[in-house]
């Protein structure tokens, strides 16, 4: 096993522990708490994949961080902070919409890279909107927290989320997953639109009809046999 993979996991475990202690003192905001919950699932998945105990990794990560801090000068710290692009949190969904449980009558699931796509294929002839909470850097989607598909009545009928065991994804991963979800929902004569906010940050533009500018290859894929995709 690559030593960098192990040490990266150890550092991530300790940093999560620090953030959790901070949150336990009720000092974290909503995006901060969302990241803690998301990263906890990711660390559990990586622990299983790597075969490394999280508690032992956390202790090892603490030693690595302490060594780095002992060697770090204040000036170097200032320069590193200045070089990191500032990201912000964009919310289409309310906390209630993000945390609400939902159920599928005819569940379908697809894994597209590090993202999991779920949808209810029992939904017919509905107007559906895709809304998401995500982080943005340089005015482009950086990390998807959660995407959900809502009918005009407010029911949840689809979802895109990260796989805990495969952390990290690109904006292209997100756009491909959205295309698969739209194709699956439209297969049953539903009308699907993407929120203007999500269009703007994922594609850099927005259409009034809610249809993002998918590439021709993606359009052909969406028009194909959905059952093989979802």
Swiss-Prot record:
The entry's keywords: Eukaryotic host gene expression shutoff by virus, Host cytoplasm, Host gene expression shutoff by virus, Host mRNA suppression by virus, Host nucleus, Host-virus interaction, Inhibition of host innate immune response by virus, Inhibition of host interferon signaling pathway by virus, Inhibition of host PKR by virus, Inhibition of host pre-mRNA processing by virus, Inhibition of host RIG-I by virus, Inhibition of host RLR pathway by virus, Interferon antiviral system evasion, RNA-binding, Ubl conjugation, Viral immunoevasion
Entry comment on modification after translation: Upon interferon induction, ISGylated via host HERC5; this results in the impairment of NS1 interaction with RNA targets due to its inability to form homodimers and to interact with host EIF2AK2/PKR.
Chain positions covered by the region annotation CPSF4-binding: 180-215
Keyword Lipid biosynthesis tagged: no
Span of the annotated motif Nuclear localization signal: 34-38
Compartments where located: Host nucleus; Host cytoplasm
Region (Disordered), start-end ranges: 204-230
Region annotation (PABPN1-binding) ranges: 223-230
Positions occupied by motif Nuclear export signal: 137-146
Cellular component GO terms, alphabetical: host cell cytoplasm; host cell nucleus
Molecular function terms, GO-annotated: protein serine/threonine kinase inhibitor activity; RNA binding
GO biological process, one term: symbiont-mediated suppression of host mRNA processing
The UniProt record lists the keyword Nucleus: no
RNA-binding and homodimerization as annotated region, ranges: 1-73
Domain remarks in the Swiss-Prot or TrEMBL record: The dsRNA-binding region is required for suppression of RNA silencing.
Family: Belongs to the influenza A viruses NS1 family.
Role summary: Inhibits post-transcriptional processing of cellular pre-mRNA, by binding and inhibiting two cellular proteins that are required for the 3'-end processing of cellular pre-mRNAs: the 30 kDa cleavage and polyadenylation specificity factor/CPSF4 and the poly(A)-binding protein 2/PABPN1. In turn, unprocessed 3' end pre-mRNAs accumulate in the host nucleus and are no longer exported to the cytoplasm. Cellular protein synthesis is thereby shut off very early after virus infection.
Subunit record text: Homodimer. Interacts with host TRIM25 (via coiled coil); this interaction specifically inhibits TRIM25 multimerization and TRIM25-mediated RIGI CARD ubiquitination. Interacts with human EIF2AK2/PKR, CPSF4, IVNS1ABP and PABPN1.
Protein name: Non-structural protein 1
